[in-house]
Regions:
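N-terminal lobe/hinge region of extracytoplasmic solute-binding protein
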Residues: 35-85, 204
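Periplasmic-binding protein-like
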Residues: 293, 297-338, 355-356, 391
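Ligand-site clamp/hinge motif
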Residues: 217, 225-270
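Structural transition elements
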Residues: 324-366, 384-388
């Protein structure tokens, strides 16, 4: 529909759909070595939200349900689940044979405590319990400080976990696989105080592995023999290395020091077609976000001209070399959106295009109108991912191609999207729906970059949020 055409011209999206992974044959080994470009920010499941931290937590933690190797949801700590006719109440029966690494049983109360604790902390991760995510009854009020955590719509009945939602949403079952929904042993956590999750001694595991050692650059996990599926686990030890550059990942892989790494860039090309590499689907969007309070970026004609200058198809060929696809809108390909389960990209006839000649003509007219020699903008980004700087460099080159725009690059630890003129936003959806990709534009969710459109907000609330 026309609304999407309007939004797409405002946010200059380019989609990076896949990542190249290198895998050595570790089947016959008892130790698995993994390299990550990021660093762990926290091993506290109530706080962690970044990919690196959640990857580690998912190795030593477990949830009600989990995805298997075929990406199908299967019972984990929950033995079974029932849903009410109105889709708003979930009842989970907890397995009796699940134990913490100290021998304590994992109970339904552990989930209640964990969820209330996260919301009481008002962490970024706890937002997944609110209407931004799972829509648990009362979560919004608790997160916003209007009510106490005791009012959360979750309780224990006959040793079963009962969860009441504010409204029916299919996202709930996807989200319970995330660490913030994992159980916590209240007695143990409170005994550790502020030191909880800072060392192996201040952590408990209910998952396949338990943390053996922790440093900034490396975490070692060993098999949790008390785990209910310990006998099905072939790997005894996992070494996770952090802060590893693309070049060092490839070097370590070639030397046999690691068994798995995700890589991008020029050096990844030599693995094309080899059995040791695979292009893994990963629904990530990189958005070039304009600030709608800016004098010039608030002009749709300026934004549309900038969009015409982005050579999206060359970002894989010249920058990433990982099988990424160019964007055709705000959503990655293969993301379900409408009630008929039709992919939004298939449902839309709108296509982003590259037209340097048309962009130059438009910019000439605009520069004359604004009495400027050049448009000048600063593009702000964080270097959390190996590809970010290279993508920012390519955007700069694209936008400066007609010599009518000057772009300065600014690397920061955290982007203030409301202050930055242009910013680079990476979005990886938690679920296979449109919600996470469109929520940043919705005023009632994040409303970044001062974007405000009543038509979009109404559509997001009634169509996207309601059907997610």
């Amino acid at each position: 529909m026309s609304l999407f055409k309007k939004i797409v011209t405002l946010v200059l999206a380019m989609s990076l759909m896949t990542g190249c992974s290198l895998t050595n044959n570790a089947d016959s080994q008892k130790v698995f070595n993994f390299a990550d470009s990021g660093y762990v920010t926290s091993l506290d499941a109530s706080k962690a939200i970044d990919e690196t931290s959640t990857n580690v937590i998912q190795a030593f933690g477990d949830g009600l349900y989990a995805y298997n190797v075929k990406s199908k949801l299967k019972p984990a700590i929950a033995k079974s689940m029932k849903v009410s006719d109105d889709g708003k109440t979930y009842t989970f029966e907890i397995r009796k044979n699940v134990k913490w690494s100290n021998g304590d049983p994992v109970t339904a109360e552990d989930f209640v405590y964990a969820w209330k604790r996260a919301l009481s902390m008002r962490s970024d991760a706890s937002k997944l319990l609110t209407s931004y995510g799972a829509a648990i009854a009362g979560a919004d009020e608790i997160y916003n400080g209007r009510k106490s955590a005791d009012t959360l719509g979750v309780y224990v009945k006959d040793k079963k976990l009962v969860v009441n939602l504010a409204y029916k949403t299919s996202r709930f079952m996807d989200l319970v696989t995330q660490p913030v929904f994992f159980p916590l042993n209240q007695k143990f956590v409170e005994a550790q105080g502020d030191q909880y999750a800072t060392s192996p001694k201040t952590l408990l595991s209910c998952g396949t592995y338990k943390v053996s050692s922790i440093s900034k650059d490396k975490i070692t996990l060993k098999k949790n023999k008390k785990c209910y599926i310990a006998k099905k686990t072939n790997i005894d030890c996992i070494n996770m290395y952090f802060g590893i550059s693309n070049e060092d990942k490839i070097k370590m892989f070639d030397e046999g020091k690691i068994d798995f790494a995700a890589v991008t860039g020029e050096n990844a090309k030599k693995y094309d077609g080899k059995d040791s590499s695979t292009a893994d689907p990963d629904s990530v969007i990189w958005d070039l976000v304009p600030n709608f309070k800016d004098q010039y970026l608030s002009d749709a004609r300026v934004r549309e001209a900038m969009s015409l200058l982005l050579e999206r198809k060359k970002y894989n060929k010249q920058v990433l070399h990982d099988g990424s696809h160019k964007a055709q809108g705000l959503l990655p390909m293969g993301i379900c959106f409408n009630s008929n389960k039709q992919f939004i990209r298939d449902a839309s006839s709108y296509k982003l295009k590259y037209d340097k000649k048309e962009a130059k003509k438009t910019l000439s007219k605009l520069l004359n109108e604004y009495k400027l020699k050049k448009f000048t903008f600063t593009l702000t980004y964080t270097n959390d991912y190996p590809a970010t700087k290279a993508i920012a460099d390519k955007i700069k080159d694209d936008l400066e191609a007609t010599k009518q725009i000057k772009v300065y690059l600014k690397e920061v630890n955290t982007v203030d999207y409301n202050q930055a003129e242009l910013s680079l936003l990476r979005i990886k959806g938690v679920c296979n729906d449109a919600y996470d990709y469109l929520a940043p534009l919705a005023v009632n969710n994040q409303g970044i970059n001062h974007y405000a459109n009543n038509e979009f907000n109404n559509y997001f609330r009634t169509e996207v949020n309601a059907k997610a």
